[in-house]
């Protein structure tokens, strides 16, 4: 764009002001979608996305050791590359999956990601705690792991999200561009967000550092790529949720993700 296409005033803690002008804004605000909100641009159409999931989560104290539970059941863990309790645990369920992240100070972050297609009508009205306890109680091993757990001081409540998926109507515009996580989010399954964001940073750096001054064309092409990539991730993730009731089919479909 033309020099000084964007302008802002920065106010420091002492009240001093500095006016800045710049050619490009890179929106790295994620779910905040700062630029699209500032410009009043519409969100994308979620009806085109096949993945439809919600999460119920919190932080807990006193979650039992999964390694100890496996040992009690005499499960063979000699092929495990590391102890289960020191890794990011993913417990695959028929209607979704559970993450379990044990921090060094004994607090555990745990959450259910559930396929909304498998939930009963009216799930939006079910309290978060009831949803959590109902699903955990359906799996005896998980019920044992959480039977003595208490909510941590923070946030000290169960949190239920609305639909996790979001996608922007556009990823770029005149003088602005969004990083992939700002453009959209599909699902925490497979943890695609970090790698996708890093690839966006790398591609935009190549565009802006190139000798070619026609940055807008390169940025627009990048934006179309990112929107297409989000829709591909949607297909990969949605297929995994469809296959979840069958361990064999779920594992086979996951291979498409690893091949991609």
PLM regions with names:
Residues 88-90, 236-237, 255-260:
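Short, highly charged low-complexity linear segments
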Residues 244, 248-260:
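C-terminal auxiliary extensions adjacent to catalytic cores
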Residues 39, 104, 190-194, 255-260:
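Short secondary-structure transition/capping segments
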Residues 27, 61-64, 215-218, 246-247:
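Poly-acidic low-complexity segments
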Residues 94-98, 104-106, 116-238:
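FAD/FMN-dependent oxidoreductases across multiple families
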Residues 1-144, 201:
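Predominantly flavin-linked oxidoreductase catalytic cores and closely associated redox partners
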Residues 18-20, 218, 237, 253:
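A general marker of short, structured functional hotspots
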């Amino acid at each position: 764009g033309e020099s000084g296409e964007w302008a802002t005033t920065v106010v420091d803690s002492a009240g001093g002001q500095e006016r800045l002008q710049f050619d490009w804004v890179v929106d790295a605000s994620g779910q905040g979608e700062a630029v699209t909100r500032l410009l009043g641009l519409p969100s994308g159409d979620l009806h085109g996305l096949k993945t439809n999931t919600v999460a119920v989560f919190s932080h807990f104290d006193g979650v039992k050791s999964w390694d100890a539970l496996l040992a009690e059941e005499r499960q063979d863990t000699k092929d495990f590359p590391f102890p289960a309790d020191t890794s990011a645990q993913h417990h695959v369920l028929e209607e979704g999956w559970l993450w379990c992240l044990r921090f060094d100070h004994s607090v555990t972050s745990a959450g259910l990601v559930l396929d909304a297609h498998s939930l009963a009508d009216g799930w939006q009205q079910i309290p978060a705690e009831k949803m959590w306890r109902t699903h955990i109680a359906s799996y005896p091993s998980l019920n044992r792991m959480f039977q003595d757990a208490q909510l941590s001081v923070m946030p000290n409540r169960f949190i239920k999200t609305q639909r996790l998926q979001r996608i922007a109507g556009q990823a770029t515009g005149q003088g602005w561009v969004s990083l992939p996580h700002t453009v959209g989010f599909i699902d925490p399954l497979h943890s695609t967000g970090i790698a996708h964001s890093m690839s966006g940073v790398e591609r935009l750096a190549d565009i802006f550092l190139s000798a070619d001054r026609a940055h807008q064309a390169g940025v627009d092409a990048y934006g179309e790529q990112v929107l297409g990539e989000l829709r591909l991730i949607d297909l990969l993730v949605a297929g995994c949720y469809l296959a979840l009731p069958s361990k064999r089919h779920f594992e086979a479909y996951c291979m498409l993700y690893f091949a991609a």
